Amino acid sequence: MAGIKDFPKFGALAGLKILDSGSNIAGPLGGGLLAECGATVIHFEGPKKPDNQRGWYGYPQNHRNQLSMVADIKSEEGRKIFLDLIKWADIWVESSKGGQYDRLGLSDEVIWEVNPKIAIVHVSGYGQTGDPSYVTRASYDAVGQAFSGYMSLNGTTEALKINPYLSDFVCGLTTCWAMLACYVSTILTGKGESVDVAQYEALARIMDGRMIQYATDGVKMPRTGNKDAQAALFSFYTCKDGRTIFIGMTGAEVCKRGFPIIGLPVPGTGDPDFPEGFTGWMIYTPVGQRMEKAMEKYVSEHTMEEVEAEMQAHQIPCQRVYELEDCLNDPHWKARGTITEWDDPMMGHITGLGLINKFKRNPSEIWRGAPLFGMDNRDILKDLGYDDAKIDELYEQGIVNEFDLDTTIKRYRLDEVIPHMRKKEE
């Protein structure tokens, strides 16, 4: 257990205070990433509605370094606890159906009466404004992928959902910078700010130029699977031994180095298809098809290791497709600490992804695993001025709640679904 005052000082965001009342991935990921950078993050949940991600493998990674507070904001006492934390926080982030907190009587204006300078971040599937029939709709990852149009760009004959949870995670990353931008605005203006993050818009924003291409010129690119829909020599290729490798032979200097390898003339040496300064071409054109055929002939005559070695020797971007075991065993992954180990209150000693974005002067840390449901209630409430008698009363009234490890294991059947915990129980 830990309280607000127990949070260690480290990282680029030491001292930043965040209240996160979101659930699943799209909202909480933002707070989780900032907690790794040293922000003090309290994950706030309702006593009867634990975060849906609890009990899944991703929870220990997305919620490490956080504190857990559980209270019923629909009750008078629980609402007071929530507003006390609003008063404490620099940023409040929530994820729910559009307008959910307005319906609870906790509009932005009410929040700013309590803390005039707080940065408010609303995360939802469809946004807080727009067509009323959309705003209150529920959304999961696949909904965001489908509604954004992004899913239609992938696959071959049928649209393809990208795993795992691309829409959720892109929205979470968008939420992360929205939180910081909103907070910086409060610093620059001295006034609170609120930002509306819609899951589908976060994913639509990374469609590159596809929407401009279609909305402006009526051109809709076909689904091409692992082949790039536009650029030639920017795809996965099957080699002589049946193994697959990605090769990206685009850009003027790369084409100069790479074309002789696959039997094409160096740009600028007389072939009209490849003039001086040639950087690449559209895959669906005659020139693009000529380039593709040359590459396919080359890889059909060489093993994947041979292709990889030659491409790397000439500084041509390439990469064989790694399985997870390849990631774990790769020397570069190991050297950067991309994989690390830590202790988690729910799952015990685990191995997973380490800290990304390596800060030189203010490094990030993992100082604790993801807390159990309500694990830090008592310490947080004491930091807010509650005494033991009052805290006991809140528990008796069901306004606050918590699960110990045994309750957690039974509720989520962890001894059945998590292999290393099953062995532990046996």
From Swiss-Prot:
Signal peptide: none
Keywords, sorted A to Z: Bile acid catabolism, Hydrolase, Lipid degradation, Lipid metabolism, Steroid metabolism, Transferase
Reactions performed catalytically: lithocholoyl-CoA + cholate = choloyl-CoA + lithocholate; deoxycholoyl-CoA + cholate = choloyl-CoA + deoxycholate; allodeoxycholoyl-CoA + cholate = allodeoxycholate + choloyl-CoA; allocholate + deoxycholoyl-CoA = allocholoyl-CoA + deoxycholate
GO MF annotations in UniProt: bile-acid-CoA transferase activity; choloyl-CoA hydrolase activity
EC number: 2.8.3.25
pH effects: Optimum pH is between pH 6.0 and 7.0 or the hydrolysis of choloyl-CoA. No activity is detected below pH 4.0 or above pH 9.0.
SUPFAM superfamilies: CoA-transferase family III (CaiB/BaiF)
Active site: 168
InterPro entries membership: CoA-transferase_III, CoA-Trfase_fam_III, CoA-Trfase_III_dom3_sf, CoA-Trfase_III_dom_1_sf
GO biological process assignments: bile acid biosynthetic process; bile acid catabolic process; lipid catabolic process
Domain of life: Bacteria
Family designation: Belongs to the CoA-transferase III family.
Protein name: Bile acid CoA-transferase BaiF
Annotated gene: baiF
